[in-house]
Amino acid sequence: MSKEIKEYKKYSDVPKEYRFDLDYLLEGKTIDQLFDQFLEKSKKLIKIKDSKYQNIESYLESLKLEEDFNLLNNKIINYISNNISVNVVDSHFREISQKFEFMYYSFFNQIGDENQRILEHEEKITKWLLDPRLASYKKALDFVFKSKKHRLSKEVEDYLIKVSRGNIELYKVYGILTNSELDYGYALSSDGKRKIEINLSNRFNLLKDQDENIRKTTYLNWNKASAKHKETLSSLLYQHFSKLSADALARGYSSTVNSFLFEDQVDEKLLKNLYDKVSSNKKVFQKYYQNYKKFFEKKNSKQMEAWDIYLPLVVVDEKYSIEEAQDLVLKSLEPMGSEYISKVKEAFSSRWVDYLPVKNKRSGAYSIGSTHGIDKKFILMNFDGTLNSVSTLSHEMGHSMHSYFSDKTQPQSLSSYPIFLAEIASIFNELMLKDYLLEVSENLETKFHILNESILNFVGTVHRQTLWSEYEYTLYNKIDKGEPVGTYTKIDEIYEQISQKYKVSDLKNHHPEDEKNVIGVNVPHFYYHFYVYKYAIGMIVANVFYQKYKEEGKQALEFYINKFLSAGGRDWPVEILKDAGIDLYDSKIYDLAFKNFEQTIDQFVEIGNKLFK
């Protein structure tokens, strides 16, 4: 294993093999030439926006033009966004991006309300759908017809489109307040030699610091700063929810939550199953927390406090080179079969991945979307040589391979998979890597670290996101009914009530010296239109697929690739999973997921008992 990852001052200094191959997207042309093609294709679509409904042949021809337009759009978006990601202050690509945004929105405004035109020709299109040439468009068109009952008058819809750029976006106000204007104070070391300003970027690293006073002052000062603005934060969240509630009820939805579920054609029963099964499995989560607390107190000879939960019990300083990380990912995924492995090797050799952190590069990691028609499913990361970075590479490769199999198997109109399904393949890859690393590692501390990270991932995704989702669900429903819940006191009361249902730790949420943690009004995800439950579902489903693989072997992997990875968006999410052997309305699927999770906890406890005596 390598000890250090070489640092580079400029992106251009990074070796070519560790950078994106973005010139591939241009195919020998310039970006301005692609813009010219974009304008040419957009003019054709605008010209035929009404005449294409004259007969089925004209309509089919227009759909082909739209697909060509979308393929070009994908290349342009991939080229611009990836270039900006590797240097977020690059003025050249920012200007290019602004130019394209203007072109795109100009097209969008001229093309107008396509759904309205579809509805005006509903009778005609319904007959055309009997033609097999329109089979791949049936899902989207049927959804437009089904959505008709939730549309307002043509004049109102036109007005809403025209004034949309003036909409107040409260999540942006929330972001400015919490990212820039809140003063979180300083973390102070026990000896007084370190004084570190607390911000969103360093908060969790400070909570992992070996110095208890750094952790304590980070925890308390963060909470105090947030609590100081609790009424402002409450007002922002309440107004955001109220706006969405008013819109949903005006459009004839039975509730705000059902307006969100409608987009994925999900029944509310799925939420009830999720909330009931996760909260009823509290004992499994408690098993982890009780043992973690025991190990912590044995190691540190002190009572565990709320600011101690992120302190690592073991320090794993193993470092991996990019090539070693690639090798680990390949070996862990070997059971996936020859096509899967061949494509991952191609991803590494053909420069799908931009690996190394440099100044002004976007933080975090992603596997890019809008990939149909593009062979390279680009991945950005900030590789630092840690086990976590190896896991990130495997995770993002899961997304990219999902895109590869979906794009290869499905027509363009059905190739894109929704957020509801997006995290399953990436988490599945993490589980493959976890078990491979446990198998080959001989170091107990490394194994303990791997298991703990996997458990925390499950807890953070399933337990926390489900709690948050039921809280959102409850708050939306109260606002729909007109209940007066617009103050911090009322909102916090709701959050505390839901928290008690899921409570697994006996640690205090706040300290006598401290203002209360106002988490119920201070989570950015609450501004993302009720989607955190999808993260929990993704983790549950990935664990079910993985448990099936452990019980059934390679046959389960072939089924997973053919029925899930290759499905794209060919059907609604629940139906795709049902076809892949997982019925989300059957509460028994949670038993399989928690079985796999509890096996991981058992391994964690077994090794922890050896390390902390």
Swiss-Prot record:
<dbReference type="InterPro" id="IPR042088">
    <property type="entry name" value="OligoPept_F_C"/>
</dbReference>
<dbReference type="GO" id="GO:0046872">
    <property type="term" value="F:metal ion binding"/>
</dbReference>
<keyword id="KW-0378">Hydrolase</keyword>
<keyword id="KW-0645">Protease</keyword>
<keyword id="KW-0479">Metal-binding</keyword>
<feature type="binding site">
    <location>
        <position position="399"/>
    </location>
    <ligand>
        <name>Zn(2+)</name>
    </ligand>
</feature>
<dbReference type="InterPro" id="IPR045090">
    <property type="entry name" value="Pept_M3A_M3B"/>
</dbReference>
<keyword id="KW-0482">Metalloprotease</keyword>
<dbReference type="Pfam" id="PF08439">
    <property type="entry name" value="Peptidase_M3_N"/>
</dbReference>
<feature type="binding site">
    <location>
        <position position="402"/>
    </location>
    <ligand>
        <name>Zn(2+)</name>
    </ligand>
</feature>
<keyword id="KW-0862">Zinc</keyword>
<comment type="similarity">
    <text>Belongs to the peptidase M3B family.</text>
</comment>
<dbReference type="GO" id="GO:0006508">
    <property type="term" value="P:proteolysis"/>
</dbReference>
<dbReference type="GO" id="GO:0006518">
    <property type="term" value="P:peptide metabolic process"/>
</dbReference>
<feature type="binding site">
    <location>
        <position position="395"/>
    </location>
    <ligand>
        <name>Zn(2+)</name>
    </ligand>
</feature>
<dbReference type="InterPro" id="IPR013647">
    <property type="entry name" value="OligopepF_N_dom"/>
</dbReference>
<dbReference type="GO" id="GO:0004222">
    <property type="term" value="F:metalloendopeptidase activity"/>
</dbReference>
<dbReference type="InterPro" id="IPR004438">
    <property type="entry name" value="Peptidase_M3B"/>
</dbReference>
<dbReference type="InterPro" id="IPR001567">
    <property type="entry name" value="Pept_M3A_M3B_dom"/>
</dbReference>
<dbReference type="Pfam" id="PF01432">
    <property type="entry name" value="Peptidase_M3"/>
</dbReference>
<protein>
    <recommendedName>
        <fullName>Oligoendopeptidase F homolog</fullName>
        <ecNumber>3.4.24.-</ecNumber>
    </recommendedName>
</protein>
<feature type="active site">
    <location>
        <position position="396"/>
    </location>
</feature>
